[in-house]
């Protein structure tokens, strides 16, 4: 399966964890029991997002002008956490790919304004973490 498919799997599990308040581990088990195969990449991302949630939320709060994480829709919040985790912890996913994939998830699963919101927040995070493109200085 593709990374895009794995991201969708991770998104579904992380979303369910967010809206129900359930830990991700039993949800991973339920996914396998009822839906079958879960990509290793999806499992890695789910566990990573759960482990890093507080840090991810702190970064998102710092760049999402006027929209603290708790005010975001659960769908947008989940997409942002997933993409930010990839940007910070998955070396073979360039930040721009994580942003583009998150925008695609937002187009498929969130509201009309979500793709621009998600893209804007993640580009702000990218600038803050990695520095502005072309300035030659790390963030």
UniProtKB/Swiss-Prot annotation:
Q: Which GO terms describe its biological process?
A: DNA-templated transcription termination; transcription antitermination
One GO cellular component assignment for this chain's record is: cytosol
One of the entry's Gene Ontology molecular-function terms is:
RNA binding
Q: Does the keyword Transcription regulation apply?
A: yes
Q: Does the keyword Transcription regulation apply?
A: yes
Alphabetically list the UniProt keywords. RNA-binding, Transcription, Transcription antitermination, Transcription regulation
Mark the transmembrane ranges: none
Annotated SUPFAM superfamilies: NusB-like
User: Known Pfam families for this protein?
Assistant: NusB (PF01029)
Q: Which cysteines are joined by disulfide bonds?
A: none
Alphabetized InterPro entries for the sequence? NusB-like_sf, NusB_fam, NusB_RsmB_TIM44
Role played: Involved in transcription antitermination. Required for transcription of ribosomal RNA (rRNA) genes. Binds specifically to the boxA antiterminator sequence of the ribosomal RNA (rrn) operons.
Q: Which protein family is named in the record?
A: Belongs to the NusB family.
This one is known as Transcription antitermination protein NusB
